[in-house]
C-alpha cells in the first residue's frame, strides 16, 4: 500500500490496533511517518464484546484502550509521539450512547473520526466486492450516504486477506484525482 501511495504522490492515515504495535513492526510505523502519512488510534483490542458489551459502549474500556494504544505507540516511536485521532471499531455511527465517551476522549485530547465512503472490503462476504470493478462500483455507490460532503474519508483496510483493496488502490486514487480531489491526512 505504501509503495502505491508513494508512486501516486498521495498520503493516507493508517489506523492501528494497539495490540499489533510492537518493536517487530516498528519499521513499518516509522516508514509511514517518514513518508508523510499519519498514524492514528483504532483501540487496543478491536473487540466489540469488550468495547460495546450488549451493544452498549463501555466508556472506561474504550478510554483505557485508547490510552494503552497511545502507550504502545510511544514505546515504539518515542515518548513524544502523539496522535489525536481515534476511529471507533465498527464506526461511531454504528453505536448509540457514545456522547459521554466522546467527551471523555476529548478531555484526553482525542477526537473521533468516521468515514463517509467505503470500498466494501470489510462488508460481509455476501456483499463484499470480489473484483476491482465491483469495488469501484461499491465505492462510487457509497457517495449517496453523504452527497453534500466536500471532504471524503474512505474506509479501506490493508490487512491480510485484503489483496483486492491493494490491487484496486491505483484505480481508487485515480477516481478521486479525476474528480479534482486532493489527498491529505487526518491529524
Question: PLM ranges: what are they?
Answer:
Residues 46-78, 92-150, 164-167:
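Alpha-helical scaffold elements lining the catalytic groove of polysaccharide deacetylases
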Residues 30-33, 102-107, 171-174:
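Short, surface-exposed basic-aromatic patches at helix termini and helix-loop junctions that form
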Residues 36, 83, 110, 149-153:
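Structural motif
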Residues 15-19, 42-45, 86-91, 115-120, ...:
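Active-site-proximal beta-strand/loop segments in catalytic clefts of secreted hydrolases
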Residues 2-13, 75, 148-187:
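Terminal accessory/targeting
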Residues 1-88, 175:
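Active-site beta->alpha N-cap acidic-glycine motif
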Amino acid at each position: 500500500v505504501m509503495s502505491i501511495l508513494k508512486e501516486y504522490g498521495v498520503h493516507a492515515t493508517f489506523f492501528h490496533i494497539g495490540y499489533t504495535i510492537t518493536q517487530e513492526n516498528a519499521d513499518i510505523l516509522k516508514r509511514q511517518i517518514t513518508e508523510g502519512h499519519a498514524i492514528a488510534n483504532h483501540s487496543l483490542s478491536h473487540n466489540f464484546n469488550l468495547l460495546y458489551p450488549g451493544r452498549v459502549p463501555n466508556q472506561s474500556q474504550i478510554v483505557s484502550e485508547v490510552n494503552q494504544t497511545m502507550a504502545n505507540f510511544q514505546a515504539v516511536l518515542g515518548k513524544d509521539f502523539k496522535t489525536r485521532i481515534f476511529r471507533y471499531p465498527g464506526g461511531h455511527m454504528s453505536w448509540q450512547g457514545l456522547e459521554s465517551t466522546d467527551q471523555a476522549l476529548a478531555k484526553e485530547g482525542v477526537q473521533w473520526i468516521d468515514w463517509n465512503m467505503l470500498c466494501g472490503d470489510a462488508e460481509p462476504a455476501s456483499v463484499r466486492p470480489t473484483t476491482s470493478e465491483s469495488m469501484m462500483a461499491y465505492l462510487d455507490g457509497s457517495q449517496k450516504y453523504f452527497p453534500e460532503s466536500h471532504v471524503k474519508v474512505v474506509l479501506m483496510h490493508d490487512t491480510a486477506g485484503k489483496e483486492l483493496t491493494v490491487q484496486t488502490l491505483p484505480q481508487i486514487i485515480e477516481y478521486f484525482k479525476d474528480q479534482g480531489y486532493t489527498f491529505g491526512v487526518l491529524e
